[in-house]
């Protein structure tokens, strides 16, 4: 189990990024972290990985305390893997060589089998002999994920893992990756702006605002009852509708056009969304 206990961190006294964060995550569970840019998502992942010296609080994985650079010559926990947005790949060797980099050379057959398995997960078999410098940003992102999984981690930390990947590839890659992690019982934390990472694949969702945890619950519960417009807006367009004396939040699909109503609206635009039209009215 991962236990994050009342941690705070700032890059300076005047720039506190994480304010008293507390949550737990069971082994094998998947957590998504959402929030506006600059709210602390990436910083939280770095803190959990052990790249930062906390101002206060502590982090435990099972019986082991996660300690920062002050306590390690090489920061970062050995049984965690962290995939940042800059990938940190080796550009002049092939895709398969990047994946094999941290696998044992004493067991070449096992290393090759593991590499082929991960190439299937990231849908990159056709590029196994391609040098990384010749790949697109999205392809590099997929290789970085595979390399992180090569020596099977207990906890995988992913920072915007599908941000540079083509839309037509995202869905199948998500399904492959998260199914693989569940099958291997690998705990995963994903920092993301994309609601699809959370709604379809996460066991828990944390929303951050103003450097604090605003909500922490199952994604379905947060989506159905978002409490604040800021939270609802992470998933979809949202309307504040007055019902009686109360103001309630409603997604577009929860509003219907009827022949007779106490409320009138004038359509000012419409947007084709493939399976439906989004109507803008005032």
What are these regions (language model features)?
Residues 210-211:
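Conserved ABC ATPase "signature" C-loop
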């Amino acid at each position: 189990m991962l236990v994050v206990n009342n941690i705070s961190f700032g890059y300076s006294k005047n720039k506190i990024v994480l304010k008293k964060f507390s949550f737990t995550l069971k082994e094998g569970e998947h957590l998504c972290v959402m929030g506006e840019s600059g709210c602390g998502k990436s910083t939280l992942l770095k803190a959990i990985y052990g790249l930062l010296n906390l101002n206060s609080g502590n982090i435990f994985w099972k019986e082991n305390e996660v300690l920062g650079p002050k306590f390690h010559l090489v920061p970062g926990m050995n049984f965690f893997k962290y995939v940042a947005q800059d990938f940190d790949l080796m550009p002049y060797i092939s895709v398969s060589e990047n994946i094999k980099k941290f696998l044992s050379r004493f067991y070449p057959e096992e290393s090759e089998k593991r590499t082929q398995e991960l190439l299937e997960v990231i849908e990159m078999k056709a590029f196994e002999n391609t040098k990384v410098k010749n790949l697109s940003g999205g392809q590099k992102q997929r290789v970085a994920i595979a390399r992180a999984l090569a020596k099977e981690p207990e906890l995988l930390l992913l920072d915007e893992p599908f941000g540079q990947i083509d839309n037509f590839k995202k869905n199948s890659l998500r399904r492959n990756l998260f199914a693989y992690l569940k099958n291997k019982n690998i705990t995963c934390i994903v920092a993301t702006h994309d609601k699809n990472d959370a709604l379809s694949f996460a066991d828990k969702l944390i929303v951050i605002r103003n450097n604090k945890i605003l909500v922490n619950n199952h994604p379905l519960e947060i989506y159905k009852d978002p409490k604040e417009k800021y939270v609802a807006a992470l998933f979809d367009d949202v309307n504040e509708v007055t019902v009686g004396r109360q103001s309630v939040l409603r997604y577009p699909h929860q509003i219907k056009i009827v022949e007779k109503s106490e409320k009138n609206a004038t359509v000012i635009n419409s947007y084709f969304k493939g399976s439906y039209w989004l109507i803008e009215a005032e």
